[in-house]
Amino acid sequence: MNKTLIINAHPKVDDTSSVSIKVFKHFLESYKELISNNETIEQINLYDDVVPMIDKTVLSAWEKQGNGQELTREEQKVTERMSEILQQFKSANTYVIVLPLHNFNIPSKLKDYMDNIMIARETFKYTETGSVGLLKDGRRMLVIQASGGIYTNDDWYTDVEYSHKYLKAMFNFLGIEDYQIVRAQGTAVLDPTEVLQNAYKEVEEAASRLANKYIFSLEE
């Protein structure tokens, strides 16, 4: 059974005025029309759900686990939650990340989420010749990103789009090489309606591709 995991990294989880949320909802409507009844869709809202960060409790728990020591109740609780997040991620084969671009990078809760899924011997392993991703089984990743600026003009902004560079590099590292980003960009300088319409078209095409169906234009 195929499973799609939606990773909502917007601080305002259901903000109807958010461009990234609008584009995501348009994608989801299109996607649901195309997938079979056997497809499962799950969603994690990073700013509503508990997503542990790497802090002294987590570091202490990891050290104790490595030494075979007993965890405190707090350490056990946080590591169990981290394991739940990891297993949910591993159980999917298609991923959709929704985020606003803040100061050229991903939201902080998305970084915390990445720290929950980038676990040695689970999603990658160390070898004598370097690290190897363990998710090389045809998984697919779609990133929906909204931004006030434009990041595809091959200029200074392109160089500092750290969100895209980081996510693409990390998921490639884990073995997920089918990576696509849809940008609803330029909301601060372009006509918002035009930005949305362009992004809607792109996510419709992305939904079709991810559902293994293709839209053919009669005007070709």
Curated annotation (Swiss-Prot):
Cofactor: how bound: Binds 1 FMN per subunit.
The gene coding this protein: azoR1
Enzyme Commission numbers on file: 1.6.5.-, 1.7.1.17
GO MF annotation: an example: electron transfer activity
HAMAP family: Azoreductase_type1
Domain of life: Bacteria
Source organism per UniProt: Bacillus anthracis
Gene3D superfamilies named in the record: 3.40.50.360
Designated name of the protein: FMN-dependent NADH:quinone oxidoreductase 1
